Each structure stands twice: as structure tokens, then as C-alpha cells.
Swiss-Prot record:
Protein's name in the database: Hydrogenase maturation factor HypC
Gene name per UniProt: hypC
Organism lineage: Bacteria, Pseudomonadati, Pseudomonadota, Betaproteobacteria, Burkholderiales
Family: Belongs to the HupF/HypC family.
Functional description taken from the UniProt entry: Involved in the maturation of [NiFe] hydrogenases. Involved in the biosynthesis of the Fe(CN)(2)CO cofactor.
Pathway(s) per entry: Protein modification; [NiFe] hydrogenase maturation
Organism per entry: Cupriavidus necator (strain ATCC 17699 / DSM 428 / KCTC 22496 / NCIMB 10442 / H16 / Stanier 337) (Ralstonia eutropha)
Top-rank lineage group of the source organism: Bacteria
Length: 90
């Protein structure tokens, strides 16, 4: 499954690069597919590339949903429903 996430563009860099902020985490991404992106835009990031812009209200709503999912979903390192994916089958 592939997942693209909204992130706010906080810095433009040389060579069609930019820095995005996602809940305090900053990451350098490629803006090669988004020539018109400006600081302050919310962009959709997929595998290190900005692939589109998103309305700020929609971006905030999506980020709130991700935060809620994180609160109710167990961490990936915890077994789900008593199962341990690292155990050998019996």
C-alpha cells in the first residue's frame, strides 16, 4: 500500500529541492514535479517527491485524522490480537 501525506513547505532550496514540516519533523524533498510551490503551501509528499498541492484546511483535517489513528492504532512493534509476526509457524 502506498501513502502520500500532506506537509507544509517551509523552505525552498537549490536544485528543485525544498524542506517540509510534518508535525515538527523536517525533511528535504524534491519539488521537481511542483515548479509553482511556494513557502507556506501544503504539498502532498509521496516517496520523497511533492506530487501536488492541497488546500490548507484539507491538509490540517487529514493531519488530525492521522494523529487520531496514531492514538488508537497499536505501534507496529506490538503484536496485534495476540499474534507475533516474528514467531515461526507451529
Amino acid at each position: 500500500m502506498c501513502l502520500a501525506i500532506p506537509a507544509r513547505l517551509v523552505e525552498l532550496q537549490a536544485d528543485q529541492q525544498g524542506v517540509v514540516d510534518l508535525s515538527g519533523v523536517r525533511k528535504t524533498i524534491s519539488l521537481a514535479l511542483m515548479a509553482d510551490a511556494v513557502v507556506g503551501d501544503y504539498v502532498i509528499v509521496h516517496v520523497g517527491y511533492a506530487i501536488g498541492k492541497i488546500d490548507p484546511e484539507e491538509a490540517e483535517r487529514t493531519l488530525r485524522l492521522f494523529a487520531e489513528l496514531e492514538r488508537v492504532q497499536p505501534p507496529a512493534s506490538e503484536p496485534m490480537h495476540g499474534m507475533n509476526i516474528h514467531q515461526e509457524p507451529a
